[in-house]
Amino acid sequence: MKVVLASHNAKKITEMRAILSQMGVEVLSQRDVGVDLEPEETGTTFEANARIKAKAVLEATGLPAIADDSGLMVDALDGAPGVYSARYGGPGLDDTGRWQLLLRNMAGQSHRPCRFVSVICCAFPDGSEILARGECPGVLAEGPSGAGGFGYDPIFFLPQLGKTMAQLTPEEKNQISHRARALAGFQTEWEKRHNGTDQ
């Protein structure tokens, strides 16, 4: 089955395509179907924002659409930046500027648990949807390490591996990331739907 990915983030598209292709899902980008949408993320939860994005692309294309809303939640900041992770610090900052700001805001803070959260929503033309959530716990590093990944990956330390998310190979990341975990939950629901076991 073909689904349109409601994202313009090339690295996110590559990551999701790698995981979804193993399920036999053909992932199309918005560019592939001649659409250029960037719906405003007005939700206050990851679930709401994923739903907004998936439904907008579904309505524009008539094809099933899958969206991910994800972010970093830092315990010491009451879950911030959370749903505002991609906009943390305002529109003038890039990924590096955002994690640098976060590190400045955490200066002197010894309590550094955090988690990446991803919510996947797939909206179908019949009005139904699949919603799945994945989390990956970690610790906010004192400084960046690694050149892989994107977003906050260079400062997201995984104690069990002794590496930041940015130090992992794409294959390693696709085994343990929040997005991989959300997609595993999505896969379970997808298989139920397509094997007729959800009725």
What are these regions (language model features)?
Residues 2-4, 10-199:
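Anionic-ligand binding patches
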